[in-house]
């Protein structure tokens, strides 16, 4: 309702959670005089690159200068930082699903959370927040501030699952093609991209998994009783996805090794055949060379059957070599 008006202030979404799974939008101008009911919570989602966002955060948010500096940092890694007064900073990463972007170029979302207030900042759009808005519009969204950050982490993790499944299916397909066709050559560029993508995802997801483990142990007064169980489940899910990413990297290595072995075997066979052919024709070339030298005359040069005799001699030598190679099991 107020999105266009709020956008000029850098405010992407401003919502008051009603404590029942729904939410109502508010305008940026209502923030200064906003009075929340006991069951309500405020969620402000800002565009970090907007100048008004930085101005509001430092002058009107009530956050410490230390917290503002961290929220506005250019480059961050997933981290969890408890603050005084039962507040916390939570930095997470999500899969980049924006058009033309690489998924492993993960999108950062920075979150300040307190008992009845959540402030989140992003630079690039996040699908996770869009899905969260749909849930709130249907009255099935988070009811409290603690549930809000939990839902956001859950949607971010679900996107990881979709990408990991897609990478595993690509590796499955390459393995099946290699098994079905000995002459199949995998596309090295696409296969290596899987390895690079898995490495890029692991860089941010590994510390994010540790953060979820930390959140299972944090006991803040405004956390719900079962929040720890949900954070633990997210930790287990992300651990499984990281294991699948590592497995995908190893399987890509095995695919490339199998292709290298096939190429090496094919090359060895080719060189072996050339060696056999050379072994057969080398003595024959030696004999024809001897027949061609003009020392004491050319044998059989006066005989009308000389050429035929020379040919029969060469054929006999070739057959003798073939028999010897067969006897030695070289062919």
Language-model segments: residues:
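Hydrophobic alpha-helical transmembrane segments and their immediately adjacent juxtamembrane loops
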Residues: 236-331
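Peripheral, non-transmembrane regulatory/ligand-interaction domains of membrane transport proteins
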Residues: 1-224, 230-233, 237-240, 244-247, ...
